[in-house]
């Protein structure tokens, strides 16, 4: 079946609001096995919306319209639809997260679905009510499996699986950049559930073979920080963190995981050079010669926190998150991350792009990825050495 997505709102046209709804709906269509050839944004104008709907119904079986459903003067979607589909059967979608309900209009073979503009309202409404409704409209069973990777870029993943990513292929493979992580989603269509599941298995096996240690989970619900905590627990390790530019975000991600008290010892934020010297024992000469944003300082930070807390594993982060302070030699987005696993120290250099918040978030993901990599490599070497 063919789906078309229409997003309504002047704020989308002016760039005041980013259109995350269209991305979400398009992704859900992939899960359903539907094809989406057009996505359109239209302002709060009834005649333009009606014109767009009439065009969409000529080329799509299902039209997903989001936005313009509230009580404000510029919420014109429902009235526009009523005038075009005055004889359609109407099914109401209850909004459990807001005031404005959604609607499904059934007009012969066409389905027009109206959804609120707020993502907090749209996403649960679609997932809980619209997705099951649409699933019944197809005789195909759709099953998906998500493989989550870290410590690798989306381009590197795509380059490695070009031969597997044929759009006409079943199962269908798609990659998604998730702020430093890469998620690979495998979607299979079949007439029976067992057949769809069977089709996915060899693809997942091949992905595991190609990416090996970069894959941290094949379960949708498992986060990167959860996988790190599980790894620490499995190896009976305690961890401490020392952060500068990330300001405690790494510790916060770890502490979000239930049961982390079994492995997490201490988290420090040493933003100033003075704090780095006083708390960690970073040398004044090192700071003067290399500056706080350097591999040398990241190394002394991670060694200092190891001595201070006696943790088995320690991680340090220092960098330039911007927007100011960058130079040609040390630009904004330059980050050094150190990891010490039982005395084996590794320091990596990273270059991130984006605003201050995005750079810090990417740095945290990189720190978790490096933590995981270093622990795995340490124990693989220990195991090999014991053979």
PLM segments and residue spans:
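Short alpha-helical segments enriched in small residues
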Residues: 195-201, 207-387
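N-terminal small/polar loop signature for handling phosphorylated ligands or for N-terminal nucleophile
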Residues: 23-84, 88-89, 295-310
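Glycine-rich phosphate/diphosphate-binding loop of Rossmann-like nucleotide-binding domains
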Residues: 1-39, 197-198
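Proline/glycine-rich low-complexity loops and linkers
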Residues: 48-51, 58, 72-137
């Amino acid at each position: 079946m063919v789906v078309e997505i229409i997003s309504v709102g002047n704020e989308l046209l002016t760039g005041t609001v980013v259109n995350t709804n269209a991305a979400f709906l398009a992704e859900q269509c992939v899960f359903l096995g539907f094809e989406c050839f057009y996505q359109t944004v239209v302002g709060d104008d009834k005649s333009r919306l009606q014109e767009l709907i009439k065009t969409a119904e000529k080329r799509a079986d299902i039209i997903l319209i989001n936005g313009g459903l509230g009580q404000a003067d510029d919420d014109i979607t429902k009235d526009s639809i009523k005038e075009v589909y005055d004889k359609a059967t109407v099914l109401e979608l209850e909004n459990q997260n807001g005031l404005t309900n959604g609607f499904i209009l059934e007009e012969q073979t066409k389905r027009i679905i109206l959804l609120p503009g707020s993502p907090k309202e749209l996403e649960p409404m679609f997932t809980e009510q619209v997705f099951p409704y649409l699933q019944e409209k197809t005789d195909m069973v759709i099953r998906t499996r998500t493989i989550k990777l870290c410590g690798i870029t989306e381009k590197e993943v795509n380059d490695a699986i070009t031969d597997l990513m044929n759009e006409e292929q079943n199962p269908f493979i798609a990659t998604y950049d998730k702020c430093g992580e890469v998620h690979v989603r495998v979607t299979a269509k079949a007439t029976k559930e067992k057949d769809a599941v069977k089709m996915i298995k060899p693809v997942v096996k091949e992905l595991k073979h190609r990416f090996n240690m970069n894959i941290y989970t094949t379960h949708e619900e498992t986060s990167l920080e959860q996988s790190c905590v599980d790894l620490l627990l499995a190896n009976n390790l305690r961890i401490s963190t020392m952060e500068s530019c990330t300001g405690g975000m790494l510790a916060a991600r770890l502490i979000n995981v239930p049961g982390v008290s079994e492995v997490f010892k201490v988290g420090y934020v040493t933003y100033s050079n003075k704090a780095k010297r006083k708390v960690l024992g970073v040398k004044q000469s090192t700071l003067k010669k290399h500056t706080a944003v350097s591999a040398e300082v990241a190394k002394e930070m991670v060694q200092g926190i190891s001595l201070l807390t006696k943790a088995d594993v320690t991680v340090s982060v220092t960098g330039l998150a911007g927007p100011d302070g960058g130079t040609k030699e040390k630009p904004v987005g330059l980050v050094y991350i150190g990891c010490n696993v039982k005395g084996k120290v590794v320091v990596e250099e990273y270059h991130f792009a984006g605003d201050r918040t995005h750079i810090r978030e990417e740095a945290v993901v990189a720190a978790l990825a490096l933590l995981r990599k270093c622990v795995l490599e340490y124990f693989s070497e220990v195991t090999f050495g014991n053979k």
